[in-house]
Amino acid sequence: AFSFLRFGVDNIPNTTELIDAQGNVNYDRISYFSAADMGFLLSYGRKLNENLAVGGSAKIIHRKAGDFATAWGFGIDLSATYQKEDWKLALVAKDVTSTFNIWNYHLTDEMINTFYLTGNDLPQNGIELSLPRVILGASRNFKFKKDLSLLFEINTDITTDGRRNVLISGEPFSIDPHLGAEFNIKNIVFIRSGIGNIQKTPDLTGKLIYTVQ
């Protein structure tokens, strides 16, 4: 399969030229740009037997912020699912080879001058690296009657880019678990609930406590 994805924000005001050479604010100098991430994916999957299926995607990433910043990157994702009766297990490995995004900046002299005047660092051409991430998941479906069932699921995101503010934080691995349930009525009504985004945040006294969503 071939897929194209775009995630972006349009009509962002560019105020780097808001003030003219005489120091006057001129709103007519405001222009607008879009910031978007685009992905071109070539995917393949197949069923190895009645229980096991595998697949993968090769992706080309293009990132763009107006006319002054562009990036190209490449990466590979792999996955596998195993199903046995009411149990399902899944593994997704994202950015297996690490995904490299090569950034190039094209700034006008006015933009560069604005960066200096506002005390901001000039962006430099470079490589943005997305390290591998593994997602493990398991689910179990409980059938009560012909038209009623309850599905439980647990997922864990395992990142490899160092300590994160998650339940299990380590170096270089951090683990972020998620729990969820879905109550199914006649395949028409679905009631869902879940727990995730477990983090340490300060309370009113400044003490760190765990919070969940």
What does each model-found stretch correspond to?
Residues 1-213:
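Subset of outer-membrane beta-barrel
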